[in-house]
Amino acid sequence: KNMHQILDLALPAYDELFEEINLDGLVESKGILYIWNEKDLKSRELEIQIRKELGVKQQIVNQKEIHDLEPNIKRFYHGGVYYSYARHARNPKKILLKLFELFLKKGGNFIKQKIKNVEFDDEKPILKSDNESFFFDKIVITCGAFSKRFTDNLNEKIPLDTERGYHVHFKNCDHLLNRPVIFSNRGFGITPMEQGLRVVGTVEFGGLNNPLTKSRIKNLIDNAKYMLGDLPEHEDEWLGFRPTLPDFLPVMGPSKNYKNIFYCFGHHHLGWTLGPISGKI
């Protein structure tokens, strides 16, 4: 509910960026479908009502309507919600590379360095790497789950943690779904992409350094087959770090301790969604 205002700005911010790049089929506007296996809406009434009060366009769908939208899903479901206006990326990496090229074209400068800490000279921030120092008038710390190392260094006590989320791909299977589908009861989703079907899900508080938990990969594979039946051998096992705070709100704005340092991190499950509007900081 508290994220509604910034989420309302997400698609217009993307549209503004997309006016300047050739998407070439990299984004599809086919909506997103959430499904569940409860036989009534009682457990879903609160979230549906809150979205209704906020003016979110949502369509409650029954078994037949779900089957019409996604005929390849096994019929374990009893209902769901369809957000027809939603979009999804067919290849996020290609989109990011196009935006990166636009950044350089507009005069942006990219320097690849491993930054160790932030220091100051006459109240101006200095980014320190092993071998170099970079001087700025202002900086924005946007390092996702890795931002805490810098905020701790700046004596800014921010309770940032990481929700580890897992991913697997099933190659050449994207034709099985028309749009992203989230199975709410089991906490996972599947998106049709250029690389095939991307299956994502779970939340694991495992920090930034612990190894991948194999049982969670197996859980994703089992859930994908529960939804779609037989699938080929999976590939590309990996996990990502969702930067999250206890109140589930991102940190966006100036530091309390330093007038020329700004923060923009902690977008939990919505980093890709809120990237363009957050970038306006």
Task: Set out the residue ranges of the language-model regions.
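Active-site substrate-recognition segment that forms the wall
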Residues: 1, 117-120, 124, 133-260
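Surface-exposed helix-capping loop/turn segments at secondary-structure junctions
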Residues: 16-28, 105-109, 156, 228-233
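Helical element adjacent to the flavin cofactor pocket in flavoenzyme catalytic cores
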Residues: 42-54, 76-138
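General small-molecule cofactor/ligand-binding pocket signal
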Residues: 59-61, 109-111, 235
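Mid-domain beta-loop-alpha active-site segment that forms a flexible
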Residues: 86-101, 145-146, 216-223, 278
